[in-house]
């Protein structure tokens, strides 16, 4: 490997030179180009000797800037006592061999550095620095010696600036982080521990925390007795909580005083939009001032009487109320920021915000969420450095759990409110009736699983509760929108909470005179509680609790004494008990396996769904005998038609007579069972064309015919829906293709024009 390649490899390994994206054919030319402006050299000397090249131009624009950077590098190399080159030797590239010699000498002068810390504490470096650094080096050595002799005490520092690691053995720190220094060496690089990770960081990026007996974190001293360390480090963590709380309160005050309060008189936005941006920041700011003062008062007490966790728990109810309200409003504020970004950016910049001004407002409105997350981390750190016998230990654990729960609730609430806003602002497919915005505010919304009637199939639905109606939506197949699935009036609605035997389902049931029975499965117990609470309040009813098995049996058999019945349902007759009750019951007619209410709702109600569950309750019919050839004669004669008409008249008269008799008997004898038409037992003769083209006649029951027709209608609707969806997708694809073709044609036209222009210029 020649000297040029060695220097390139060295610079890349130190992280001061970016690795080339393709193979370099001429390393010397690559070095000349990379080092010409002096930026890489200044980074190099700052990497090797932190603080030696603090002022240099990152983006030199002229020769003077480049020469200045090179001179800054040469001044930093003076302490290494190596042969230097002239600045113009590098800038002009004429005497580049001298540049290589200097870089090689710098590499050799620093190659004795220990491998733990790159660019740090070389032994040769300390001797080369001369007498100017003798005092500082001896002080650092003395500090290192003291920490070695007394392992229970060490330097505790706080980061003044952000530092991002460039090598694996370095430590990334953020401003405000507390670092436990484990090793102090000459050269400006210290070793420390942060969040369980140990690495090197520049010493001029941190400041020492002024405190007596600064102990190591208990986790940094494995195998040592940590009780005393924990006790001594506790004040440092508490002080960090107070400082961050004080900073947060000041940020809220600044946000209100500088931007939000003046925004109230801004005439470019409506009062509703301004209210969405303000939210309850005023209340949160006042509350944080109260919390800050309470924590300050706690910190003044003796350590064994400090109840930081108790202070948080006393105010937890206010925390929950204020921050949940803020989270519920935040999606509306984001919507206003998006819709009026130009106006708000002008306003923010007029108030002194840096460009882009909208970014300041966006990040400021997100700080309450970040602060909630920070409380969990701060209290966990406090608990780690607190004795278990401390009077506040239990309250700190409770506060950690409470804040975790609050953070989770806030995240769920924000997602739900964002979804509500999306539903209200976008068009809903197959919507029926007046616009959704006229229904008022959404009281509650969540995603549930629904079972209709006695069906075993669960369907995913989005329930939206308004003041007088429960709206049902489903997600589109591509999750690009929502589809209208119906609405349930709250009038006459009854609720039943279902308790599953295994206890792993959160279910309730909705029923009523004007609706089909629906079983709803919630995702969590909290979601179930919210639905039952809101629905009971709006329906002004009560909620019964039954087991899941009892619920199904109650809907599939006749009711017991005192059971509420519908207006068309016959009363239940209680027979006195006798020995005859022990006899086997006679076989039920097929239709009697279903309750009266379900049979009538299936037959008489205009439903869009075929009651497949009824077929499950009915026993299979016996195999019908094969009809003779005489029965398959085509019936197209006038006599045959007249015969069919007579049969239909008989059925119609039977239905009318049964209904009339039921009306009379219900008026005179309320306890008697009215005559009920069982359409399943009534037969009709129909003509049907088989797949082979032959027309045959069959005898079918009325209920089977109705079901068959409903199934056919349902299939036709589904087919129509699929065709409509395919047509929409086809139209969308055609539009996308048209846009693509137009864009390609435009690009082709521009390329041809440029080519023509180049040819004409060459000819000229």
From Swiss-Prot:
Residues 435-540 form the PH domain. GO terms for molecular function: guanyl-nucleotide exchange factor activity. SUPFAM superfamilies: Calponin-homology domain, CH-domain, DBL homology domain (DH-domain), PH domain-like, SH3-domain. It comes from the Eukaryota. Its main location: other. GO terms for biological process: intracellular signal transduction; lamellipodium assembly. Residues 233-413 form the DH domain. Residues 109-149 are annotated as: Disordered. Gene3D superfamilies: Calponin-like domain, Dbl homology (DH) domain, L1 transposable element, trimerization domain, Pleckstrin-homology domain (PH domain)/Phosphotyrosine-binding domain (PTB), SH3 Domains. Residues 134-149 have a biased composition (Polar residues). It is found in: Cell projection, Lamellipodium. GO terms for cellular component: cytoplasm; lamellipodium. Residues 1-110 form the Calponin-homology (CH) domain. Residues 152-211 form the SH3 domain. Keywords: Cell projection, Guanine-nucleotide releasing factor, SH3 domain. SMART domains: CH, PH, RhoGEF, SH3. Acts as a RAC1 guanine nucleotide exchange factor (GEF). PANTHER family: RHO GUANINE NUCLEOTIDE EXCHANGE FACTOR 6, RHO-TYPE GUANINE NUCLEOTIDE EXCHANGE FACTOR, ISOFORM F. This is Rho guanine nucleotide exchange factor 6. It comes from Gallus gallus.
């Amino acid at each position: 490997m020649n000297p040029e390649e060695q220097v390139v490899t060295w610079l890349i390994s130190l992280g001061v030179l970016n690795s080339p994206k393709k193979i370099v054919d001429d390393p010397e030319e690559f070095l000349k180009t990379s080092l010409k402006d002096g930026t890489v050299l200044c980074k190099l000397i700052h990497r090797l000797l932190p603080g030696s090249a603090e002022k240099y131009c990152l983006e030199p624009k002229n020769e003077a800037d480049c020469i200045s950077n090179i001179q800054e590098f040469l001044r930093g190399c003076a302490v290494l006592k190596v042969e230097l080159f002239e600045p113009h030797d590098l800038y002009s590239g004429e005497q580049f061999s001298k540049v290589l010699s200097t870089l090689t000498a710098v590499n050799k002068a620093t190659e004795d550095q220990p491998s733990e810390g790159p660019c740090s504490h070389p032994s040769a470096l300390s001797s080369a620095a001369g007498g100017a650094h003798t005092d500082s080096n001896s002080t650092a050595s003395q500090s290192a010696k003291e920490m070695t002799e007394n392992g229970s005490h060490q330097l505790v520092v706080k980061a003044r600036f952000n530092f991002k690691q460039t090598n694996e053995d370095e430590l990334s720190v953020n401003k405000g982080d507390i670092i436990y220094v484990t090793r102090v060496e000459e050269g400006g690089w210290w070793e420390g521990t942060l969040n369980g990770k140990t690495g090197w960081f520049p010493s001029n990026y941190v400041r020492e925390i002024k405190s007596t007996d600064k102990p190591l974190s208990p986790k940094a001293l494995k195998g040592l007795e940590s009780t005393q360390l924990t006790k001594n480090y506790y004040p440092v963590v508490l002080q960090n909580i107070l400082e961050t709380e004080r900073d947060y309160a000041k940020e809220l005050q600044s946000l209100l005083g500088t931007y939000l309060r003046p925004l109230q008189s801004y005439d470019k936005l409506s009062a509703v939009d301004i209210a969405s941006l303000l939210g309850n920041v005023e209340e949160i700011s006042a509350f944080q001032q109260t919390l800050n003062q309470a924590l300050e008062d706690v910190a003044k007490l003796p350590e064994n009487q400090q109840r930081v966790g108790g202070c948080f728990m006393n105010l937890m109810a206010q925390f929950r109320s204020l921050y949940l309200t803020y989270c519920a409003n935040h999606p509306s504020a984001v919507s206003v920021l998006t819709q009026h970004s130009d106006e708000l950016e002008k306003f923010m910049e007029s108030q002194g915000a840096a460009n882009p001004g909208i970014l300041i407002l966006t990040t400021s409105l997100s700080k309450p969420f970040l602060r909630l997350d920070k409380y969990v981390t701060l209290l966990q750190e406090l608990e780690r450095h607190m004795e278990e016998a401390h009077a506040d230990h239990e309250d700190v654990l409770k506060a950690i759990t409470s804040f975790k729960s609050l953070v989770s609730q806030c995240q769920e609430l924000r997602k739900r409110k964002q979804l509500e806003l999306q539903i209200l602002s976008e068009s809903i497919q197959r919507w029926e009736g007046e616009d959704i915005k006229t229904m008022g505010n959404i009281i509650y919304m969540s995603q549930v699983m629904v079972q209709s009637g006695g069906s075993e199939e669960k369907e995913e639905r989005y329930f939206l509760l308004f003041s007088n109606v429960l709206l049902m939506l489903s997600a589109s197949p591509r999750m690009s929108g929502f589809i209208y699935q119906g609405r349930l009036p709250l009038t006459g609605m009854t609720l039943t909470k279902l308790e599953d035997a295994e206890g792993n389902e959160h279910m309730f049931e909705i029923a009523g005179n004007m609706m089909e029975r629906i079983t709803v499965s919630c995702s969590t117990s909290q979601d179930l509680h919210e639905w039952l609470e809101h629905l009971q309040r709006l329906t002004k009813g009560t909620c019964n609790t039954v087991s899941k098995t009892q619920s199904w049996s109650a809907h599939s058999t006749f009711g017991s004494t005192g059971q509420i019945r519908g207006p068309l349902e016959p009363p239940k007759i209680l027979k006195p008990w006798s020995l005859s009750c022990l006899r086997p019951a006679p076989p039920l007619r097929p239709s009697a396996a279903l309750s009266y209410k379900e049979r009538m709702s299936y037959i008489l109600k205009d439903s869009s769904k075929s009651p497949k569950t009824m077929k499950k309750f009915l026993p299979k019919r016996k195999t019908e005998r094969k009809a003779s050839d005489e029965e398959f004669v085509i019936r197209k004669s006038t006599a045959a038609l007249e015969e069919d008409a007579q049969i239909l008249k008989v059925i119609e008269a039977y239905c009318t007579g049964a209904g009339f008799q039921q009306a009379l008997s219900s008026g005179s004898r309320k306890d008697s069972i009215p005559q009920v038409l069982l359409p399943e037992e009534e037969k009709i003769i129909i003509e049907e064309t088989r797949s082979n083209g032959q027309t045959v006649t069959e005898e079918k029951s009325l209920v089977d015919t109705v079901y068959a027709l409903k199934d056919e209608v349902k299939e036709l609707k589904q087919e129509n829906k699929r065709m409509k969806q395919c047509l929409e997708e086809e139209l969308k694809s055609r539009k996308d293709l048209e846009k693509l073709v137009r864009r390609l044609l435009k690009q082709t036209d521009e390329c041809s024009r440029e080519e023509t222009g180049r040819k004409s210029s060459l000819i000229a």
